[in-house]
Amino acid sequence: MKIKGNNVLITGGASGIGKIMGRMALEKGAKALIIWDVNQEALEATAAEFASRGRVYIYKVDITNSQLVAQTYQQIKDECGSVDILINCAGIVRGNKTFDQQTEQDIRLTFEVNTIAPMIITKEILPDMLRRNSGHICNIASAGGMLSTPKMSVYAASKWAAIGWSDSVRIELQEMKSNVHVTTIAPYFINTGMFNGVKSPLLPIQQPEPTARKIIRAIERNRTFRGIPFGFHFIRFWQAILPIRVFDFVFGTVFGIYHAMDNFTGRTK
């Protein structure tokens, strides 16, 4: 779907890759950029930075609060008009702990932000897209949603669920012959601060600018799925043909993915 002339809503859009995609959307002529984030200071700084690039609307939203999501979406419709492109980008990770060390609070929060919130937001916005028979939903999942990864089991589970939901909605819309499209993105670790401390001996940590560019391009081309880097498109193929122990050796030992989180620290603020 074209970015130019359309309203783009990005959750988690005041920092990291969400912020970069917002800038790119404005550069491509988005009618308005709508940013949801929980960090008021970052929202205001982003709005000031982007002010000369186009129309920017900022909203402080706790996306785990379904009532606030509904209220804010109504406010958007009153102030900005329709949401043509929704990018569910907000996410959290609680890593460097084995599952037995995870707290119930961390488990619930991870699923509320990474899995349930995109569903609630999409459920709020999708009916209007269906009525217009136009729109695009892009869900930022993770390569961790295709690979079992020690010390981030809860995060991986939340992203496995996100991928299953996102692609199922895509098929539902396809069978409805709707002109609303869904793109699922599964990137490897991205160097935005969210995964500080992660080590990847053979597979390169992805850089934010080219990653954001690939996501925007996937939206514009109505791609159904985009692994980043491209080789992650073949993960399921290798899982299907390799014995589990061989797969574990190749991806866990040779590529070092199973130990990527050993020194994880994440964002410090």
Region roles according to the model:
Residues 40-41, 60-71, 104:
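The beta1-alpha1 cofactor-binding region of Rossmann-like NAD(H)/NADP(H)-dependent oxidoreductases
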Residues 172-232:
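SDR active-site lid
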Residues 142:
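Residue(s) in the substrate-gating loop at a strand-loop-helix junction
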Residues 30-46:
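Conserved glycine-rich Rossmann-like NAD(P)H-binding loop of the short-chain dehydrogenase/reductase
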Residues 97-99, 103-108:
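Substrate-binding pocket helix/loop in short-chain dehydrogenase/reductase
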